[in-house]
Amino acid sequence: MQCSWKAVLLLALASIAIQYTAIRTFTAKSFHTCPGLAEAGLAERLCEESPTFAYNLSRKTHILILATTRSGSSFVGQLFNQHLDVFYLFEPLYHVQNTLIPRFTQGKSPADRRVMLGASRDLLRSLYDCDLYFLENYIKPPPVNHTTDRIFRRGASRVLCSRPVCDPPGPADLVLEEGDCVRKCGLLNLTVAAEACRERSHVAIKTVRVPEVNDLRALVEDPRLNLKVIQLVRDPRGILASRSETFRDTYRLWRLWYGTGRKPYNLDVTQLTTVCEDFSNSVSTGLMRPPWLKGKYMLVRYEDLARNPMKKTEEIYGFLGIPLDSHVARWIQNNTRGDPTLGKHKYGTVRNSAATAEKWRFRLSYDIVAFAQNACQQVLAQLGYKIAASEEELKNPSVSLVEERDFRPFS
């Protein structure tokens, strides 16, 4: 009788195990992105060739957009910010840099870099755990009772500008535009914001303050995190043109060169070469596919995203294992064929994306482009950016300067 009882117990346990396995298999099975896109009116256009991906719905995904200034990172950030189940933060490492690195050094020394990277990794680790209190160490003046009005670009985060973190007058689903967020929301309560973070399945952070993917290795290998790195790159010539227009004082000598046709003797060429060196070092690491980056790294060229934003966004979400939200699809539809007058704000995201990616060719003189091509020839070749052999070729929009490359995720 005792043996029969044990046999029944074993059978029951086996049955539970089988059911659990079946449930796990079902929840992790492939879901097609098209049902969500149908709500945005995009299914007919996208579903025929849209790939299917296996989605992991049980574990929080931690996403880091690794980029540099004027590479399209604000646009990529919005691809996550618009997802209803993603908690997105725009440049929280700004606070680290602003607190630790003296403005006059701009963080260029090796010592500054080590200090910045160590503090940045600690902060990122805490933020991915939704520990927003850790950010208070870098906010001036210090928050009082965990409330502050000093969060950098708070308005760029959808969650921080909507209920329950912000309670403006209006409908329950109201999300404020960035310019209205701070004015109408008042002080940010970090306790409430942290709770909103914990309620979401994924956390995404954008940064332009980590030079290379190798600087993130400790976080990538941290078993407590499910970190996936989206490295965004852009043609360095395009970055130079965009920075010269946006940061007019800092890049004054480049503008002087463009205006006079003569290269200033005291031109700070590191404003260009540092970008190229960081890209080259980071991409070399990523494309070598070291074991610690397996399933953790995806290289995205801004030009590919600009030419086909929906297709590339689907690939990104597929790599992350997250279903594509219809709100993201709708945002792409509304913000990649925009009125050019709406894209004049230097940090704006409403634009004709394909035209924006090529605009640099008409904003730099050929002698500046030739100089950049010589200084950055290694990374241009690595990333598939073609050399403009003449001014005629540079200014001819029918001649593409971007090679067809398939930078597949390392999975």
Curated annotation (Swiss-Prot):
It catalyses: 3'-phosphoadenylyl sulfate + keratan = adenosine 3',5'-bisphosphate + keratan 6'-sulfate. InterPro entries: Carbohydrate_sulfotransferase (IPR016469), Gal/GlcNAc/GalNAc_ST (IPR051135), P-loop_NTPase (IPR027417), Sulfotransferase_dom (IPR000863). 3'-phosphoadenylyl sulfate binds at residues 69-75, 234-242. Widely expressed at low level. Expressed in brain and skeletal muscle. Expressed by high endothelial cells (HEVs) and leukocytes. Glycans are attached at N56, N145, N189, N334. Residues 24-411 are lumenal. The keyword Membrane applies. Its EC number is 2.8.2.21. It is found in: Golgi apparatus membrane. Its main location: Golgi. The chain crosses the membrane at residues 3-23. One of its GO terms (cellular component) is membrane. Residues 1-2 are cytoplasmic. One of its GO terms (biological process) is sulfur compound metabolic process. Pathway: Glycan metabolism. A motif (Cell attachment site) lies at residues 337-339. It is an enzyme of class 2 (transferase). It is a single-pass type II membrane protein. This is Carbohydrate sulfotransferase 1. It comes from Homo sapiens (Human). The lineage of its organism: Eukaryota, Metazoa, Chordata, Craniata, Vertebrata. The gene is CHST1.
